[in-house]
């Protein structure tokens, strides 16, 4: 799948689930299940409830996503 086909959205972590999964509420109000991308897992980026994150979605399954970036709170 090409990078141009992925949908990128902003979301907020609602709940931390088992197995590295998260429940994320997107900016349009939809709640999806997401997992952490490989580079974030390797670099041990901690994600907590309330964090704002970037999520990539596949156009084929809009109920699951991949967390690609955690925004710093300023």
Curated annotation (Swiss-Prot):
Q: Which top-rank group of organisms is this from?
A: Bacteria
- What are the coiled-coil residue ranges? none
Q: Which CDD domains match?
A: S1_IF1 (cd04451)
Record flagged with keyword Cytoplasm: yes
Compartment(s) where it occurs, according to its Swiss-Prot or TrEMBL record: Cytoplasm
Domain S1-like intervals: 1-72
Classification via InterPro entries: NA-bd_OB-fold (IPR012340), RNA-binding_domain_S1_IF1 (IPR006196), S1_domain (IPR003029), TIF_IF1 (IPR004368)
Q: What does this protein do?
A: One of the essential components for the initiation of protein synthesis. Stabilizes the binding of IF-2 and IF-3 on the 30S subunit to which N-formylmethionyl-tRNA(fMet) subsequently binds. Helps modulate mRNA selection, yielding the 30S pre-initiation complex (PIC). Upon addition of the 50S ribosomal subunit IF-1, IF-2 and IF-3 are released leaving the mature 70S translation initiation complex.
> Family, per the entry?
Belongs to the IF-1 family.
From the Swiss-Prot or TrEMBL record, give the protein name.
Answer: Translation initiation factor IF-1
Q: Which organism is it from?
A: Ureaplasma parvum serovar 3 (strain ATCC 700970)
Name of the gene encoding the protein in the UniProt record: infA
């Amino acid at each position: 799948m090409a990078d141009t086909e992925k949908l990128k959205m902003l979301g907020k972590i609602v709940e931390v689930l088992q197995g590295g999964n998260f429940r994320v509420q997107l900016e349009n109000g939809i709640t999806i299940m997401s997992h952490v991308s490989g580079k974030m897992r390797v670099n041990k980026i901690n994600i907590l409830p309330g964090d704002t994150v970037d999520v990539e979605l596949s156009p084929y399954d809009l109920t699951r996503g991949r967390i690609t970036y955690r925004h710093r709170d300023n």
